[in-house]
Amino acid sequence: MEQVYSVTQVNNYIKNMFVKDYVLNRIYMKGEVSNCKYHTSGHIYFTLKDETGQMACVLFAGYRTGLPFRLEEGQSVIVLGSISVYERDGKYQLYAKEIKLDGLGLLYERFELLKRKLNEEGLFDPSHKKTLVPYPRTVGIVTASTGAAIQDIINISKRRNPYVQLVLYPAKVQGEGAAKTIVAGIKALEAKGVDTIIVGRGGGSIEDLWAFNEEMVARAIFDCSIPIISAVGHETDITISDFVSDLRAPTPSAAAELAVPEIESLLSNLVDYHYSLVQCVMRKITMARSELEKKQLQLTHLSPVYALRQKRQYTIDLENKLRQRMNELIRYKRHLLDIQIERLKAASPLDKLKSGFSYVSDSSGKVVNSITKTKPGDELTIAVTDGMIKAKTIGVESIER
């Protein structure tokens, strides 16, 4: 009968095969990280995969001290380790001892490190962002002299406002030395005194766009005294230049729209500003005229001639009022006098004489209005309407009533 082996024996046998294999005992493997998990023990468990296959991997805590970056999903890495069997599960896996970023992964890591460094230095702080010139006369462009980017910028700028001058600094935008020419372009346009600078290029891979992730370019943008618009690649492409620039445009075409205002809008604004200015000036003139008239009136009131005229008029008015009151008083008194005269007339003996009555008085002038006030022999005077009658009392006779 054939020999029968236990599962453990088979797993152990296979493990020994891996251990004795020179290639598998020390092997470099390249792939993309997925299913990355950090265990509480300090170990890192992850899967290394490519287009058609995958392998389980583990980096024990003792080897993590040599890992210069944080292992994350999607990173392209090269792993040094050994392949062996995990006997409990009967599965083989890569036991990693060293992990390095590879290709794109290394670029992404450099990107994140520089991004973190510049952010900590404050180069991305919004307080450092400069405001674009609203009505630029000159726009500088740092990009390649050939390609779609410069043509898009020229076409859109001329359509929006043909009076804005475009100044191109032909820079190398990818490959060796590209970052230096971009920095030189920024400094040259700053020295020329343009109003706004567009720094960018068309789309491409992360390697193609890498010049705009260089630290020297980021610092040149930050140190520039002129507002800079970053316009690198397409909307989904993000570079360090986008973070440090004063304004990010998703494309070079969008950058031209941001930098160059439409002339129709400018003309409309000018008409509005002219109308507002005229209205403002007219309001100020009206206010000034009103204030002048007010001051003139105040000066007139403070004039000695005006004061004398006012006093003279006051005197005339007072005189007229006094005369009016005097006339009213005279008329009133005359009216009272007329009343008294009428009363006196009504009581006057002379008026009664005209009615046929007479006035009798004795020799002493006392009125004789009773028989008791005279006696026979007394001389009397009888006053009538046209004179006096001298008479003597002959006798008196009482009349019964």
Swiss-Prot record:
Record-linked PANTHER family: EXODEOXYRIBONUCLEASE 7 LARGE SUBUNIT (PTHR30008:SF0)
Family annotation (InterPro entries): Exonuc_VII_L, Exonuc_VII_lsu_C, OB-fold_nuc-bd_dom
Function recorded in the entry: Bidirectionally degrades single-stranded DNA into large acid-insoluble oligonucleotides, which are then degraded further into small acid-soluble oligonucleotides.
Assembly notes: Heterooligomer composed of large and small subunits.
Keywords assigned: Cytoplasm, Exonuclease, Hydrolase, Nuclease
Lineage: Bacteria, Bacillati, Bacillota, Clostridia, Lachnospirales
Family: Belongs to the XseA family.
UniProt organism field: Lachnoclostridium phytofermentans (strain ATCC 700394 / DSM 18823 / ISDg) (Clostridium phytofermentans)
Protein name in UniProt: Exodeoxyribonuclease 7 large subunit
